[in-house]
From Swiss-Prot:
Entry protein name: UPF0260 protein Pput_1301
NCBIfam families in the cross-refs: PRK05170.1-5, PRK05170.1-6, PRK05170.2-5
Family: Belongs to the UPF0260 family.
Domain of life from the UniProt record: Bacteria
Length: 149
């Protein structure tokens, strides 16, 4: 049994989280907003350093989060009901960690109280991304950074 004074992500199921609690699990790394390529042979997913046109390349925040689906119809919306599909998310992702019953890392803003730690610890790709406006889609393969685990 988990103590009542434990943080919400340790004592609640994903389905029990409020919208605010759910949104706060996002560490602000921006990795889910990077373009990904799928290997046709083995279905592996590879992250590129090519960012969605709405992603601020320094802050790793969406520049129009409330209206993102109007600008990017295939933008991914993470919800508790899709937790079984989170395997493509980085192993550091708060959504993935909590869905797997794991704790948040020490650098996560809900643990340390500092939203900049995700950048200072180089978890995010802040300053290392390119906008999709600047790279032709045929060249995305040249910008692979890691394979989803």
């Amino acid at each position: 049994m988990i103590a009542e004074n434990a943080p919400f992500w340790r004592r609640k199921t994903l389905e029990q989280l409020s919208q605010q609690e759910w949104e706060s699990l996002c560490d602000g790394c921006g990795l889910c907003c990077l373009q990904k390529l799928e290997d046709e042979d083995d279905n592996s997913v590879y992250y590129t350093r090519i960012a969605c046109k709405l992603l601020d390349l320094d802050t790793c925040q969406c520049s129009d989060y409330p209206n993102r689906f109007a600008h990017v119809p295939d933008c991914i919306q993470l919800t508790p009901g899709k937790a079984d599909q989170f395997k493509w998310l980085p192993s550091t992702c708060g959504y993935r960690l909590v869905s797997e019953g794991k704790d948040l890392p020490a650098w996560h803003h809900l643990v340390c109280g500092d939203r900049q730690q995700v950048h200072e610890q180089r978890i995010s790709q802040s300053g290392r991304m390119l906008s999709e406006h600047d790279v032709h889609e045929d060249d995305w393969e040249d910008h692979l950074i890691f394979r989803a685990s």
